Amino acid sequence: MTEFTVHLVNRPGALATLTEQLADAGIAIEALAAFGVDGEGMVRLMVNDPTMTRKILQSDEISFEEREILITTLRHEPDAVAVMTRSLADAGANIDAMYLLRSSAEGLEFAIAVDNHDVAHNILAV
């Protein structure tokens, strides 16, 4: 899955404008995390149509990066995240970003960006 990191001005309405543009194009947001860093708004999002999202961001000259994200589901137990992150670390895979997508009785679904997809793919069995 593709994750976009979008750079916005950190002011009221910036996120609303971005999400309205996506909605107007029929793009569904699958995951979103937004936060301010040193006066800049940063939005990490995954969508159902990366190609159209890329076109919208480029045509509006919005600064962004994109990268491939691994999706994995862990058992819903206290040590699950610790075991996974330790396994990745011991194999030499650095976690660049990680966030929870869903929590349910079936498990914890995470999006993970790593510096070595092959290693992480083998460990996570995704």
Predicted regions and their residues:
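A conserved regulatory-domain signal marking ACT and ACT-like small-molecule sensing domains
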Residues: 1-126
